[in-house]
Structure formats: structure tokens, C-alpha cells
Amino acid sequence: GKNYVGNGTFSGKTMEDFDPNTIGNRNVFIYAPYEASWQNNERPHIINILDSLDCGGFQVTAYTNQEADVAKIAEMTSYGMVVLSTHGSGGGKAVLTGEIADTTAAAYQTYKAMLQGDSPKMGISMNITISKQGNAINRKNVYKLYASYISGLAGTFPQSVILANFCGSDQTPPLRDA
């Protein structure tokens, strides 16, 4: 999908083809892989705001911490509102998942081809804080997704509102437009 900040087109349509007062559906996707490590989490606030709206009827699906893995990000294309509350990487070139990058796990074999080549769709961010409890800090290597992975997802966003709350979310055209 594309966004209005990007090139202003959506599958051959322009902004004028859409009713600005209509969102494709009331399904909300919240992807928050670092709640266990962040002091301030926006997910509960967003849910409270949606619950308080007169128009109501929002159905929220939220994935947090390690549940917010690579496979879950593929679901977001069918939601009317998407919230990505995560880390960005590489100056706006990638978005981090909560999935631990374990080269002995079965998932690694699935991802291996996407991690290789001159233009990989995925990468690995090293030594990322995934949780904090007092002075105990848990750091792991996690998968990150480049714009080519996101723009290659099956499905189309149903006139969705996308809130990209991660560092670098709009720094580079490829990730911004993905």
C-alpha cells in the first residue's frame, strides 16, 4: 500500500477518489513488540480512546512483545487502522519485530533467503532490549523488516489509517511508502 505522504496514489487511484471521512473497516491492528522494555506504552491509551468514541464498534487485535513476530505483521493489510509501536532501524530503512532471531529455530530456515542478497527483505538487529524488570535488562537479537518486505505483503489496506510510531518511520521514501 501507499500513503498520502508518499506519492499520493493507491492502486491507480488518487486522494480525490477516497472519502476522507471513511475508514475501510473498524478492525484495529496494534503491533507493539517492546512493551516489556518501554516505560510508556501507547497501546492501552489507544484502546481507551477507541472505546470512548461515540461511533464505537472497534475490534482491536494487539500483538505485544515476542508475540509481535514476523508472521503477524503480514496480517495488518486487512485492518482499517494500523498502529506500529516499535523501533525503527538504519535511519528509516527498517522496522523491528519482537521475534527473537534464533538461527537454530525452524523459522530461520523460512527467513534465510530473505536475509541474503544485495537487497534483503529482512535483517537482524543485534543486542536489542526486549524487556526490563527493575535493573534486569534482557537483550536479544531480533528480526527487522525492510520496506521491500512490507510492500510485498499480500492484500491491500482497506482505506486504512496507519500510525507509524517508530524512529525513522518517515525518514526514507521506501519505508514511508511501504
Residue ranges and their predicted role:
Residues 3-121:
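A domain-level signal for caspase-like cysteine endopeptidase catalytic cores
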